[in-house]
A protein has these predicted regions:
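Functional cores of ribonucleases/endoribonucleases
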Residues: 3-119
Length: 119
């Protein structure tokens, strides 16, 4: 089965959106604290990737009762974003993920290298 077949609601907290958009204060904070940030190319790319994952994404990871999230993802043929490193290097990203809170259906999107590995 593809796509997200449950009711979901976009989590509109700016902190969850801005941390994945280039040139925001959230990204600058991540670079200072963690030395890297995973960002989409721009807001339009974030919105497009989100819609495609909602329609065609695959559930990832194993069913983990201790994990509060469900994850859906999809590989794209063109880069959707990059990892920005503090020293200035970039790694292109081709995988997008929607992370959904199991109990509320609230979600946000993340550009990644690959699906998250769950234990």
């Amino acid at each position: 089965m593809t796509g997200i077949n449950r009711s979901i609601i976009l989590d509109r907290r700016p902190s969850l959106i801005d941390r994945h958009l280039p040139e925001t204060s959230q990204v600058q904070r991540l670079l200072r604290r963690e030395g890297k940030a995973h960002v989409f190319h721009d807001r339009e790319t974030l919105d497009r990737v989100t819609q495609v994952i909602i329609e065609f994404g695959e559930r990832t990871g194993s069913e983990d009762p201790d994990d509060d999230y469900e994850r859906y993802g999809l590989y794209f043929s063109e880069p959707i974003g990059c990892i920005i490193r503090k020293e200035g290097s970039l790694i292109l990203l081709y995988y997008g993920e929607i992370k959904t809170v199991k109990s509320t259906g609230e979600y946000y999107s993340i550009p990644r290298i690959s699906p998250r590995e769950t234990s």
